[in-house]
Each structure stands twice: as structure tokens, then as C-alpha cells.
Amino acid sequence: VQPEAEAPDRWRILAIVAVGVLLAMAPWFSASAVATPLAAEWRLDRLGLPTLTIAVQVGFAVGALALAMTAAADVLPARVLFAAGAVLAAAANAGFAFLATDLASAVPFRVATGLAIAGIYPVGLKLLAGWFRAERGLAIGVLVGALTVGSALPYLLRAVGVSQGLDWRATVGSASAAALLGGLLVFAAASRGPWDAPAPRFSLEIARSALREPAVRLANLGYLGHMWELYAMWTWVPLFLGASFAAAGASDPATASAAAFAVVASGGIGCVLAGAFADRLGRTTLTIAAMAVSGSSAIAAGFAFGAVPALTVAIAIVWGVTVVADSAQFSTAVSELAPAGTAGSALALQMALGFLLTGLTILAVGWLDPGDGSGWRIAFALLALGPAVGIVAMWRLRQRPEAVRMASGNR
């Protein structure tokens, strides 16, 4: 029996998986959301704080590769694997809040959180791939948007916690509760789609063969430029906003946390719009435009330090919308450009390298220790180097004859 042209339940499944991802991603930045009280209690310096986020990045990269190297995503139903990842992420995050007493004891819990989250987002993508064909670009855009809002969720939880006078552990505990709820939702309501197919096993040799293609290398370089900026921005913009508000004489931790949520979550809008229009505009056009605006916004945000909070937040929101809008386009480009049979391994390697790179820029900003306007201008100019390199890579990709394989010929 041939499946229908489009699965009738696809939008319901998209809503379930998107909400599940949004909730289950909450533990990721829970340490960044409580950076100020955590640093005071544990006496952390500016290198100690980013270490807690970098540990998650490393855990995720290792977990994503391990998932790709095994048949776990095919042996276990995707909804079961998703729920298991969410439960483990919630438990590890709770361990960080209620069992860890210093940086050394917290890092293993943060690494475990990243390992567990590797069973959430990639598995969510696999679930949706079984339900969508022609509209897969939009579905992936919605899912990346959900990941973005979920990454911002701890900042909203912190804003509520501060306004209620709650300890930082309440914020982290609430993020764990959100992850549990997201896992339960997907486990109870999601199901396998009519076009579900086994995921290809990861092979380093196959991935290397894909990288021999110049077009694949350029798409990967564009992705690395994008990742150079993205997660460092999400990690540090809350502290930047708090310091900027204080310099403007408007110090209020609850307002700063709420503003950080708005800035990071606004990227969800960019993801959905990019997912809807990428095939029409072309991947290189969209990625070049997004990186040009995000890189410019990074520099502008540094110069807006200490300005009227409304202006600083407005610039940061433009940055937030564009810094992640093009995220799904790089992986889609590799899937279109990689030789037959190599896309799965090429994408797994791309994701692992990208997330490992984020640790470098997150740490670099901490090492710069930007305490005032000049410090933040230098730090954000460093982040803007990523999109600058990405723009060059995607422009060179656009000139190559293989680029016609992307976005139905729209490059």
C-alpha cells in the first residue's frame, strides 16, 4: 500500500515534537541562567562559568557521534529514545543543582546533561523526517525554532525566580521539571511516521570521503563560522545585558533575565521564517544575509553597552533573530551536496565539529573577561569573525557549479 502524498497527522506530530523539544532543551543553559548567584556561592571566575556550559557542548558532541555510530536510533522507537534522553537530562541537571558543591563536582553532571540531550534534538529530527517530505524544510525550521526557545527557557525561569525571591536551585530544578514534561509528552503522543527509515551508521572514512568534495568543505566552513558565534552569544548575552543595564543605572536582575529570554527566544522567529523561505530564496542567499546581519549586530551590541536599555535590547533582539535563523541551512546544504551514501556520516561529523568549536569561543569570551564597554566590544568583535568567514565560504560555494544541487537550483 502506497502512503498518501502527505501524512495527514504530520502537523499534529510536528506540534507535539516541537513542544517536547522546547521543554526538554531547558537544562542546556540552566547554568548560564544562574551564573551570577552561582559564581558568588561557588566563588567561580570567568573561566569557571563557561566551563559549565562547555561541558554540555562536549557531552552533546560525544553523544551525537555515539548515537550515529550505533543502531540505537533504529533499535529503540524514537519516542522511547527521546523520552529516555529527556529523563536523563532532567536527572543530570537536578544533580548539578542539588548534589554538586563546586565546579569539579558539577562538571560530570553537565557532561551527562549534554550526553542525554544528544538523544533529544537529533532524535526529534528523525521523528519528523518520517512524517514530512515536501514540507520538510519548514518542519526542520520549526524544530530548530523550538530548540532555540527551549534554550532560552531557563532565562525566563530565572526571571520568575528572581521576582519571587527564590534560590538559583529553583531555576535549575524547574528546568529539569520542564525536561521531564517534554519527554513524557513525546513518549505518550508521538509515533513513527510513514516515511521513517533507518539512520545511516557513522563512518569516519565515509565522512572524510565526503569532505574531499570542495562544495561540502565550503558548506562545512560556513557552518563552523555560524557556530563560532551562535552558542557563545547564547551563553554570554545574559551577563552582557545585566552589566549593560547596571552601567545605564537600571540594574534589575529579573528584568535582565527576562530580556535575555526575549533575545535568545526571538531566534525562533528567524528559524521558522528561514525554514519557510529557504528553498525559494536559496541557501547561500539566506545564509549570507543572516550572517551579515548577525555579525553586524554583534559589533553594534558591543557599542550599545551602557546605552538606554530599550536600545540595547532592540539591537540584541535583531542579533538573536539572525544568529540562528540560518542554522538548518548548512546541514541541508551538506545533505544536497554530499556524494550518494555519505550524507549521514558527513552530517554527524559536521555537528560534532561545530559543537566542539563552540567551546573555544565560549571560553575565549570568558578569558577576555569583558567587564566594561570596551571589553564587550572586543569580545563581540571576536564573535563577528565567525560570520565573516562564513559569508566568504558561502559566497565561494555559490560560485561553484555544484551549487545548483541546492534548493532546487536556487543555490
Label each region the model flagged.
Residues A31-A35, A215-G268, S331, T361-I362:
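Extracytoplasmic gate region of multi-pass secondary transporters
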Residues A64-D102, A278:
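Conserved MFS/SLC helix-loop-helix module at the cytosolic interface between two early adjacent transmembrane helices
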Residues F109-A146:
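Cytoplasmic helix-loop-helix junction between adjacent transmembrane helices
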